Amino acid sequence: MYDKWNLPRRRDKIVQRRAVTAVLAAAALLLTAGCSSDDGGSPGGDGSASSSRTNGQTSPPERSGEQTPPAKGSVKVLRTVATGLKTPWGLAALPDGDLLVSSRDEATITRVDGKTGKKTELGEVPGVSPAGEGGLLGIALSPEYASDHMIYAYFTSASDNRIVRMIYDEKKPSGEQLGAPDTVLRGIPKGVIHNGGRIAFGPDKMLYAGTGESGDTGLSQDKESLGGKILRITPEGEPAPGNPFPDSPVYSYGHRNVQGLAWDSKQRLFASEFGQNTWDELNAIKPGDNYGWPEAEGRSDEGGFHNPLEQWSTDEASPSGIAYAEGSIWMAGLRGQRLWRIPLKGTEASAEPQAFFEGKYGRLRTVLPAGENRLWLVTSNTDGRVEPKDGDDRILELEVS
């Protein structure tokens, strides 16, 4: 029996209750008027600019005893792991080296053999209602996966965005390997746009989720709403111990649409965020901080907001997933169609961001550490934004420095 979070009739408030079986959330409004789509269209610009460091103050760096990575890095494609994926979104690595990938529009989870690329469908996640940028989004393995075989998933339902967990039984036939979903958290506002969707277990074994404001900008500053936030909960869905706001899953607020979460070697959290028309952001996350949206987009001179450590024009980035490797954050760009390297010194960039693969593989959705100096990179060319090429979508294995 778990504490469930559910939306009452007023959509932008949350309340806590206990139930054996939680009821469905009240229908969320699809607010899209006057808002741009984050997934963007065709890339713009010549790709020569990297980012802007002008305007506003940055957070003080945390540098004690840390080495600075080289100003310039490198990326080498080692191999194509898999092809022919449809609207891939979330990615999780199994202990044996195989990968699980979610399909946003088909609402399925597929296992990809890490050596041969063979694909085996686990099954369809019930209750997913794909539309616009919504559908089956992020996935993550339980920190106790070796014993509980739980897969967590963030998805858009008919009434909200929510997080569920399912037992994965690989002994069952293909297509029937997912158990019935247990709802961990419900009541995250949904929309045609700005659904967030990235989930990841942190070094503290708590579950973190990046959410969007669903096109209703006022939700980002409302600490009683789950929209436009980074959330931190226990594996059972309770507000995690030590959260900055009492009895609340909210970890940070003032976000527009968070789709990337990663921790560095010092267990510091970073998040990527879609801007509206001007600046996309990479942020160093501190519990309880306000990241400014909708009052600020990118760096701001106004007090009270935590400024991004880097920002990009939206045609260069439209960032989704991020990963940490070799002293740098690696950020996948959708509209920007490039992989960004941001070398770090503490919680600041130590050199100008560096772009790779500009336009070569199209839209890039997810990047995940693959051990040592390697990454997995997932493309996103079958999501209706561009014309897919033969073999799309694909998973690449990279060697980075």
Would you name each region that the model predicts?
Residues 252-274, 278-287:
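Acidic, glycine-rich loop-and-beta core segments that form the ion-binding/anion-interacting portion
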